[in-house]
């Protein structure tokens, strides 16, 4: 993942902070619940798409929990902190949970990695920015993103809040 443009940009900022002489803190979330909202959106529509088989593990964190980690880190002695949510699960398990919360039968379409990599190359020809984003998404589908459990809000609770809002807006 370190060869991706988006990761390199983040790491340049980290390097600059380290060399700046400033009193700094770096918080590295493993993923965000807000990114998981797309799983609920797809499940509510009846079909979810996964890049690759979805066996990689992750423990994304809720924004509110991440804010608490940031405050705690700013007040603490640790300079660099990784932050994950309370639940470690695979991407497939997260998609299945979204279907459960949406009350829909599980229908998951797997986009093979070879096809996803080809699509990334095509997208990159059309737009460097979207190509970099697509490359990040595909790469994230291949690796684990697990960190220390620092959050308390579960993914199920987050998805249930999306479901409640979805039902209210109908």
Regions found by a protein language model. Give the residues of each.
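Glycine-/Pro-rich loop/turn segments that contact NAD(P) or position catalytic residues
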Residues: 1-44
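Amphipathic terminal alpha-helices
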Residues: 140-170
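Substrate-positioning beta->alpha
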Residues: 52-74, 79
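Substrate-binding strand-loop-helix patch
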Residues: 57-64, 83-101, 114-118, 153
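Glycine/proline-rich active-site loop of Rossmann-fold NAD(P)-dependent oxidoreductases
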Residues: 34-41, 72-81, 104-106
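Hydrophobic "lid"/C-terminal helical patch
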Residues: 67-74, 95-98, 155, 162
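A short C-terminal helix-loop "cap" of Rossmann-like NAD(P)-dependent dehydrogenase/epimerase domains
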Residues: 42-52
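Terminal hydrophobic/aromatic helix or amphipathic segment near a protein terminus
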Residues: 93-142
């Amino acid at each position: 993942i370190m060869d991706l443009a988006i990761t390199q940009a983040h790491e340049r900022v980290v390097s600059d902070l380290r060399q700046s002489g400033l009193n700094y803190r770096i918080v590295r979330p493993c993923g965000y619940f807000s990114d998981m909202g797309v799983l609920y959106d797809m499940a509510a529509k009846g079909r979810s798409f996964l890049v690759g088989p979805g066996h990689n593990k992750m423990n994304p964190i809720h924004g509110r929990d991440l804010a608490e980690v940031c405050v705690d880190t700013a007040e603490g002695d640790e300079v660099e902190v990784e932050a994950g949510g309370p639940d470690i699960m695979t991407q497939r398990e997260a998609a299945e949970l979204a279907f459960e919360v949406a009350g829909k039968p599980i229908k998951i379409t797997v986009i093979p990695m070879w096809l996803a990599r080809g699509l990334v190359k095509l997208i990159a020809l059309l737009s460097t920015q979207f190509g970099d984003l697509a490359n990040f998404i595909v790469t994230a589908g291949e690796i684990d993103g697990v960190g220390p459990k620092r959050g308390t809000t579960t993914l199920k609770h987050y998805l249930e809040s999306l479901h409640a809002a979805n039902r209210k807006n109908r």
